[in-house]
């Protein structure tokens, strides 16, 4: 798997909110991890690759338990969207500390002092200027996951690939490798195969959108050293999902 095969022009990195936390130190955001991500992305940008990010909010808010506590689903989802804005601002600060230029665009209408309202043309121009664009607020509508937001924004900005880091899992398997030691890992798999086998790498809406817009998906273990940088260059154990 050579250098040029994985030298994408524009990528979208999907980061989970939970992945930003440090549970051992009881930190919602591990700033050492943010610093590490920033250093990797600095090297990616030096290669001429344009970087956008969609970040989740699971380190601040888990909507799954909201309904049983009397919070309706749509309101719980909006709380989650606000959590992604907090993460986006934290990432921006960490990136700027490493000398990167970063913008936070929100799908929700917020005060411009907090985050810019998303306009596709502006975001695209930022990417062309080697600025990192962070998309926060999910899709701006309830009942959609941040995976769907990732494929939506990847489609809108014309990303070549979505780079999706998983915690402790280095690709797509036929079954949960943490529960089934005989699970088979795929080096390459098609979106149709993912759908037919009902593999839970993203929700169905996200998978269908990525397939329709011919966006490749790279799944890798984000806990490995320099994993983001190496995944983009094909230098790490991963799975590539294609049409």
Swiss-Prot record:
Mention one GO molecular function. ATP binding
Q: Per its Swiss-Prot or TrEMBL record, what regulates the activity?
A: Inhibited by UTP.
Q: Where does ATP bind?
A: 14-17, 58, 62, 167, 173, 176
Q: What is this protein called?
A: Uridylate kinase
Residues at which UMP binds = 57, 77, 139-146
What family is reported?
Belongs to the UMP kinase family.
| Catalytic function, reaction form | UMP + ATP = UDP + ADP
Which keywords has UniProt assigned to this entry? ATP-binding, Cytoplasm, Kinase, Nucleotide-binding, Pyrimidine biosynthesis, Transferase
The transmembrane residues are none
- NCBIfam families, A to Z: pyrH_bact
């Amino acid at each position: 798997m050579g250098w040029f095969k994985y030298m994408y022009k524009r990528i979208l990195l999907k980061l989970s909110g939970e992945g930003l936390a440090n549970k051992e130190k009881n930190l919602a955001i591990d700033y050492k991890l943010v610093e590490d991500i920033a250093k990797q992305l600095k090297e990616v940008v030096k290669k001429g690759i344009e970087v956008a990010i969609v970040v989740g909010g699971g380190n601040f808010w888990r909507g799954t338990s909201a309904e049983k506590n009397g919070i309706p689903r749509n309101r719980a989802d909006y709380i989650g969207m606000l959590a992604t804005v907090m993460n986006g601002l934290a990432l921006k600060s960490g990136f700027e500390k490493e000398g990167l230029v970063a913008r936070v665009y929100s799908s929700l209408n917020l005060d411009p002092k907090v985050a810019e309202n998303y306009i596709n043309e502006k975001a695209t121009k930022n990417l062309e200027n080697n600025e990192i664009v962070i998309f926060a607020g999910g899709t701006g509508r309830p009942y959609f996951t941040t995976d769907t937001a990732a494929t939506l924004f990847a489609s809108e900005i014309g990303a070549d690939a979505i780079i999706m880091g998983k915690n402790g899992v280095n690709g797509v398997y036929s079954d949960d490798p943490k529960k089934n030691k005989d699970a088979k890992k795929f080096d390459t798999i098609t979106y149709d195969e993912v759908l037919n086998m009902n593999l839970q790498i993203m929700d169905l809406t996200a998978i269908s959108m990525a397939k329709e817009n011919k966006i490749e998906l790279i799944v890798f273990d984000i806990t490995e050293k320099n994993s983001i940088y190496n995944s983009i260059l094909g230098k790490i154990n991963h799975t590539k999902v294609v049409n």
